[in-house]
Amino acid sequence: MPSLDDLRKRISSVKSTQKITKAMKMVAAAKLRKAQENAEKGRPYSEKMKNIINNLANSIIEKETAPKLIAGTGQDKTYLCVLMTADRGLCGGFNTNICRLAKTNFQKIIKEGKTLKIITVGTKGLDQIKRDYGKYVIQKLSFKERKKISFQEAEEVGKIILDLFHKNEFDKCILFYNNFKNVITQIP
């Protein structure tokens, strides 16, 4: 049977651990709040950009004179799928939901006899698809070493996609990403 001193030390240790856990919880809550604010601040810009691109694409009457990027190749034989996930885990269904949707689309593309090419952005997506679809992965991008993701990283991904398009490496591109609704829900 433990002595009274041993019990006091154990109680003290548990209380100390509780204090540390509470502090970590407060830091995590502050980081989550900041991330949520940033996501909500960027939403109007992304919606406006989406509307501009859709209006531009819909306003083109003659496909022959339209820029190749908007008019497309006119075929749908080769699909480039860009899977965007996190580099770190412990975020619930964030990565799993988007990978599930992507895998369903990969199966459909392959079943239709189309050529599939995949670019992964984030290590968690690659980890989840590499067993079944690893042979289709043409490029792996990870920004794990960067503390904060900015426009430069998005531009890097965009340049890779544009370079592949100009080299006629694909006919259609599908982006798989989560749309932030709130802290609990991200829609793939």
Residue ranges with predicted function:
Residues P2-P188:
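Conserved loop-to-helix interface motifs that mediate assembly, gating, or partner/ligand docking
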